[in-house]
Amino acid sequence: MFVEAPAAASAGAPSLDELVVLSWNAHLAEGELRDLIGKLKSGELTGRPVNHFVLLVQELYRRGDAVPEFDVHDRSAFAIVPRDPESFDVEDHAASLGLSIFYVPSMRNGPELREDRGNAIVSTEPLIEPFALELPLARQRRVALGAAVRVQTADGPKRLELMDAHLEPLSSPKTLWVFKNPRAGQVRAILDVLDTDRYDGDAVAGVVLGGDFNTVRAGAREDAYRLARKWSTSLAHEDRRDTHMMGRLDYVFAKLEDGWKMKTRRLDERFGSDHYPVLAFFSR
C-alpha cells in the first residue's frame, strides 16, 4: 500500500538538521501512532516543534478484504491479539494522518483473521522510489522496506535513503528455534543492497537504516548489531538503554555525507507498545 501525502503537507525539502527519523515497533494496534506523531509535531519529545520527519515503523497491521481468506494449505504466523476491534489499522492511519505511507505486509496475522502485519514508512515528505526487500527466510517471512526523501544541502537537493527492517527473533524448527541465529544473514542481505549504485554518488546525502533487530540473544554483542554498527560510519552517539523487556532490540544507523553526524535517543514512553521508540537527530 502506497499513499502519498498531499502536496501542502510539506513546504519544500528540509535540510538534514531539520529532519527527524524515528524507529518504533508499534505492536500492531496496541501502539498509539497518532499520539506519538502528535507529541513529535508539538515538540514535546524533542524540545522544539518538528515539521519534517520519517517514521520507520514495524508491526503495523491491515485488516479487511484486501487480505486473502486463509486456505487450509497455507501457513500463517500466530495472531497478535487481543485488542479493540475498532482500533486503527494502516489504512485508517493513511486516511486520517495526511502523511506519506508505504506499507508492505510480511505475514498474515493469524489464520482466523483477515489481517496481515508488516513494516511501514510514514513521513511528512514525499517518498521516492519505495521498494520491498524480502529477507533470507528463517522461521517467518520478513520484508524490509526502502525509500528516499528529498533533503536540501549546500549543493542543492539530494536524496536521503532509508531502510526499515524487522529481523527474525528465532531460527527454524530444524535448529530447535534457538541454536542458529538468522539475524546476521538478514543484515548482510540488507547491507548488500545498500552497497548498490542507488546508494552511491553525489545525488545521495546519506543512508539511514533502522528497525527492530530482535537481538534477543545478546543485544549489541550480536553479529547483526556489529555488522550494522561497522557500516554506520556517521553514528556519533547512541542511546544504549534497553528498548524492550528483553533488552536492547531497536536501533538506528547511518552513513552520511562528510561533515554530518547522527545521534540517537530512546524515548521514555512506549505509546502503548512493548517497545520504546528510538529518535535520530542529524547535525554538522
Go through each PLM region and give its residues:
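Metal-dependent phosphoester-hydrolase catalytic domains
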Residues: 1-7, 127, 132, 194-208, ...
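Beta-strand-turn-beta hairpins that frame and shape the catalytic cleft
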Residues: 7-22, 115-129, 140-168, 282-284
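Solvent-exposed loop/turn segments connecting transmembrane beta-strands
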Residues: 32, 112-114, 137-141, 269-276
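His/acidic metal-ligating clusters that form di-metal
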Residues: 146-163, 179-210, 214-215, 219-222
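Active-site metal-binding loops of divalent metal-dependent hydrolases
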Residues: 24-26, 59-60, 167, 211-213, ...
